[in-house]
């Protein structure tokens, strides 16, 4: 499927990006920006891979591990939930993107709203 092929391309890109990071580190060119990007991309990619596995397994992949019909002993649904937790536990994707923008790219901090102030005139 197209989804699987896109994920395969992302896995290969991450592999080569990791090699580039190792090479930069060993040659003394270490920079925080690539490491921040890898952290964000790895969490999201792991989640997308486990979500694909859950989708491929279908409804039988969601059964409890002790059920007679369960596929893969419930490994992929557990992995999928773990990956969601890693995204949340490591800081939400938006927070990670803000860190990359501020620390890695030197962009100004996102403005904070004053107490009681809303984002727009409709209060959304």
Model-identified regions with their sequence ranges:
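Alpha-helical interface subdomain recognition
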Residues: 1-124
